[in-house]
Amino acid sequence: MTLHLHDSAAGAVREFAPLVPGQVGIYVCGATPQGSPHLGHVRAQVVFDVLRRWLVRSGYEVTLVRNVTDIDDKILAKAAEAGTEWWAHAYRFEREFSAAYAALGVLPPTVEPRATGHVPEMVELIQRLVERGHAYAAADGSGDVYFDVRSWPAYGELTHQRLDDMEPAADADPRGKRDPRDFALWKGAKPGEPATASWATPWGRGRPGWHLECSAMAGRYLGPRFDVHGGGLDLRFPHHENEQAQSRAAGDGFANFWLHNHFVTMSGEKMSKSLGNVLGVPHLLETHRAVVLRYYLVSGHYRTHLEHSENSLVEAEAAYSRLEGLLRRAAERLGGLAAGEVPAAFAAAMDDDLATPTALAVLHETARAGNSALAAGDEAALRTAAGQLRAGLDVLGLDPFAEPWASQTTGSDAARTALDVLVRARLEDRATARATKDFATADAVRDSLKSAGIVIEDTPTGARWALEGEQ
């Protein structure tokens, strides 16, 4: 089976074929670092990290570009409220986002451009649009430059909307616009704004519009046409619609596929700062393992909303621990464990529009087969099942023997180590009792451990233990 992905522009699942055989270019909208990252922010990056890993596993060379919108109206406003320089404010939260991505095992992008480092490319793109009759400088002398939506008949094709049904663009004062739906390519500097937040252009000093930034950076690093543009569902309109319109109006083919992940929700509502229902990533990592947080984020299909409740991460911890536990017991029994090939059913699920819930179900079934092989002492079957499990978890960024998880010592890991010491001491007491035929004491030890949720497995090489539900 070949990879099929849902293309938002087509409104359907299509067979994926890269523009250049063997190579895939992906642009993912990154952070606007105005505040700390929350669970909804990082879902998008985990989703496209999984896509990247699956493409690499499938033999492609992947270039992934993830931008940083480090100049924006919201950044200027937040920095002014905090009494800090706008660039310092942006950099502070950019580092928080980078730390959150790294904590969740998101691979570094091939390129991570900042908007402020690509103003010349943005000015050049505006000039092309002006020359082609698709952009104009505001007549009020504000220094604003707008995209003329009525000059581009295909405007609205990405989101399947008619122009006359759209709301006015709220990114600038409408007084200088020919049509209220025209959107800003360049924003003229305004009184009271920091001088450092503007650049000289043929239209006066100012700063780039949000939509223009991504088009210019995507073109700079991926060329005029590339394979996949990704981002959250909330970016489809107006951001991605505007990106596509301005890029194609300038003569670029732009993205061949558009992929959009859905939201993390709480009580059915999108997680957002404006609603005050966000769960900050740094806060969550104080009480939960990062790998469990990632497991939770990949447990739902990327095109469905992921409902979060107080039990979500508890359930994710239990589910991941079952997979992790089998791998650790297999590695102990086999003296090490190499990744094998992913199960065929896992590959089929991933090729079916990244059906990660189905892929995880396959891995849990594989783990059950591994546990059966372990109990039966069938090391060949154990090696096969555990190797397949490890390979599948690696695609999802969840392999406990790979970085960043292999080198982490979390509070949960430390607790597991301490528990292991205590249980092994009790198992030694049980072994001594059995050796002296004191079976009453041996049974009492076993029963006390069982009542604590610890299951004992007697093997030819000695007793082993697991938490109930892991075996």
Swiss-Prot record:
What's noted on cofactor binding?
Binds 1 zinc ion per subunit.
SMART domains membership: DALR_2
Residues reported to bind ATP: 273
Recorded catalytic reaction(s): these are: tRNA(Cys) + L-cysteine + ATP = L-cysteinyl-tRNA(Cys) + AMP + diphosphate
Q: Name one GO cellular component term.
A: cytosol
- Taxonomy, superkingdom: Bacteria
Q: Name one Pfam family in it.
A: CysS_C
- Compartment(s) of residence: Cytoplasm
Q: Where is this motif: 'HIGH' region?
A: 31-41
Cofactor names: Zn(2+)
GO biological process terms held by the UniProt record: cysteinyl-tRNA aminoacylation
**List of residues binding Zn(2+):** 29, 214, 239, 243
The similarity comment for this entry is:
Belongs to the class-I aminoacyl-tRNA synthetase family.
Q: How does it assemble?
A: Monomer.
User: Which HAMAP family does the entry link to?
Assistant: Cys_tRNA_synth
Q: What is the designated name of this protein? A: Cysteine--tRNA ligase
Query: Could you tell me which species this protein originates from?
Result: Kineococcus radiotolerans (strain ATCC BAA-149 / DSM 14245 / SRS30216)
Gene expressing this chain: cysS
